[in-house]
Design a protein with these regions (language model features):
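Terminal targeting signals and extreme-terminal segments of soluble enzymes
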Residues: 1-134
Length: 134
Protein backbone atom coordinates (compact mmCIF):
# COMPACT_ATOMS: atom_id res chain seq x y z
CA UNK A 1 0.00 0.00 0.00
CA UNK A 2 1.09 3.57 -0.60
CA UNK A 3 2.54 5.69 2.20
CA UNK A 4 2.42 8.91 0.21
CA UNK A 5 -0.63 11.00 -0.62
CA UNK A 6 -1.67 11.60 -4.24
CA UNK A 7 -3.84 14.41 -5.58
CA UNK A 8 -7.16 12.91 -6.74
CA UNK A 9 -8.74 16.18 -7.90
CA UNK A 10 -7.02 16.33 -11.27
CA UNK A 11 -10.00 16.91 -13.58
CA UNK A 12 -12.00 20.12 -13.65
CA UNK A 13 -14.90 19.85 -11.27
CA UNK A 14 -16.29 20.62 -7.87
CA UNK A 15 -13.51 19.26 -5.64
CA UNK A 16 -10.66 20.65 -7.75
CA UNK A 17 -12.39 24.05 -7.72
CA UNK A 18 -12.66 23.78 -3.93
CA UNK A 19 -8.98 23.16 -3.24
CA UNK A 20 -8.56 19.49 -4.09
CA UNK A 21 -8.24 16.30 -2.08
CA UNK A 22 -5.13 14.26 -1.32
CA UNK A 23 -5.63 10.49 -0.92
CA UNK A 24 -3.71 7.35 0.05
CA UNK A 25 -4.32 3.66 0.69
CA UNK A 26 -3.46 2.48 4.20
CA UNK A 27 -4.46 -1.19 3.78
CA UNK A 28 -6.90 -3.27 1.75
CA UNK A 29 -9.82 -1.92 3.81
CA UNK A 30 -8.49 1.39 5.16
CA UNK A 31 -7.89 4.67 3.36
CA UNK A 32 -6.95 8.23 4.29
CA UNK A 33 -7.55 11.60 2.63
CA UNK A 34 -6.89 15.22 3.52
CA UNK A 35 -7.57 18.81 2.55
CA UNK A 36 -6.78 22.26 3.95
CA UNK A 37 -9.62 24.65 4.82
CA UNK A 38 -9.57 27.97 2.97
CA UNK A 39 -11.83 31.03 3.13
CA UNK A 40 -14.17 29.63 0.45
CA UNK A 41 -15.04 26.73 2.78
CA UNK A 42 -16.34 28.90 5.63
CA UNK A 43 -19.90 29.66 6.65
CA UNK A 44 -21.18 32.97 8.06
CA UNK A 45 -20.01 31.95 11.56
CA UNK A 46 -16.40 31.69 10.33
CA UNK A 47 -16.16 27.91 10.66
CA UNK A 48 -16.09 25.25 7.96
CA UNK A 49 -19.44 24.90 6.21
CA UNK A 50 -21.15 21.55 6.81
CA UNK A 51 -21.86 21.26 3.10
CA UNK A 52 -18.15 21.38 2.35
CA UNK A 53 -17.44 18.70 4.95
CA UNK A 54 -20.18 16.53 3.38
CA UNK A 55 -18.66 17.04 -0.08
CA UNK A 56 -15.18 16.24 1.26
CA UNK A 57 -16.43 12.98 2.78
CA UNK A 58 -18.34 12.12 -0.40
CA UNK A 59 -15.17 12.63 -2.47
CA UNK A 60 -12.76 10.86 -0.12
CA UNK A 61 -15.02 7.98 0.90
CA UNK A 62 -16.22 7.64 -2.70
CA UNK A 63 -12.61 7.25 -3.83
CA UNK A 64 -12.12 4.58 -1.14
CA UNK A 65 -15.20 2.72 -2.43
CA UNK A 66 -13.86 3.00 -5.99
CA UNK A 67 -10.43 1.67 -4.99
CA UNK A 68 -11.92 -1.19 -2.94
CA UNK A 69 -14.05 -2.15 -5.98
CA UNK A 70 -10.93 -2.65 -8.14
CA UNK A 71 -11.35 0.85 -9.62
CA UNK A 72 -14.89 0.25 -10.88
CA UNK A 73 -17.01 3.42 -10.98
CA UNK A 74 -19.05 3.87 -7.77
CA UNK A 75 -21.88 6.26 -6.93
CA UNK A 76 -23.26 7.30 -3.56
CA UNK A 77 -26.53 5.64 -2.54
CA UNK A 78 -26.67 7.00 1.00
CA UNK A 79 -24.51 9.11 3.28
CA UNK A 80 -25.46 9.68 6.93
CA UNK A 81 -23.47 12.49 8.58
CA UNK A 82 -23.01 13.56 12.18
CA UNK A 83 -21.40 16.95 12.79
CA UNK A 84 -19.52 16.75 16.09
CA UNK A 85 -16.96 19.57 16.08
CA UNK A 86 -15.67 22.50 14.05
CA UNK A 87 -12.68 23.60 12.00
CA UNK A 88 -11.50 26.95 10.72
CA UNK A 89 -9.41 28.53 7.97
CA UNK A 90 -5.93 27.01 7.66
CA UNK A 91 -6.84 23.76 9.43
CA UNK A 92 -5.82 20.48 7.82
CA UNK A 93 -8.70 18.01 7.79
CA UNK A 94 -7.82 14.30 7.77
CA UNK A 95 -10.39 11.71 6.73
CA UNK A 96 -10.11 8.05 7.71
CA UNK A 97 -12.22 5.49 5.84
CA UNK A 98 -12.87 1.89 6.86
CA UNK A 99 -14.55 -0.47 4.40
CA UNK A 100 -17.01 -2.46 6.52
CA UNK A 101 -18.42 -4.80 3.87
CA UNK A 102 -18.27 -5.23 0.13
CA UNK A 103 -20.59 -7.27 -2.08
CA UNK A 104 -20.60 -7.65 -5.86
CA UNK A 105 -22.70 -4.49 -6.19
CA UNK A 106 -22.33 -2.47 -2.94
CA UNK A 107 -19.65 -1.00 -0.67
CA UNK A 108 -20.52 -0.20 2.97
CA UNK A 109 -18.14 2.09 4.84
CA UNK A 110 -17.53 4.33 7.84
CA UNK A 111 -15.60 7.60 7.76
CA UNK A 112 -14.35 10.12 10.33
CA UNK A 113 -13.00 13.59 9.67
CA UNK A 114 -10.49 14.88 12.21
CA UNK A 115 -8.99 18.29 12.83
CA UNK A 116 -6.09 18.54 15.29
CA UNK A 117 -6.73 14.89 16.29
CA UNK A 118 -10.36 15.64 17.26
CA UNK A 119 -13.33 14.14 15.42
CA UNK A 120 -15.38 16.86 13.72
CA UNK A 121 -17.63 14.73 11.49
CA UNK A 122 -18.50 11.04 11.26
CA UNK A 123 -20.34 9.33 8.44
CA UNK A 124 -21.62 5.98 7.31
CA UNK A 125 -22.46 5.35 3.71
CA UNK A 126 -23.30 2.92 0.95
CA UNK A 127 -21.89 3.13 -2.59
CA UNK A 128 -23.19 1.30 -5.66
CA UNK A 129 -20.57 -0.41 -7.82
CA UNK A 130 -21.50 0.30 -11.43
CA UNK A 131 -21.13 -2.29 -14.15
CA UNK A 132 -20.30 -0.14 -17.16
CA UNK A 133 -20.62 -1.92 -20.50
CA UNK A 134 -17.92 -1.16 -23.05
Amino acid sequence: MSNSFEQISLKHGFMKHNGGVMFRNISENEYEFKSVINENHLNAAGITHGGYLAALIDAGAGTAAHRSAQNAPCVTISLDLKYIGASKIGDEIIGNVKILKKTKTLVFLFCELKCNDKIITSASGVWKILKIKS
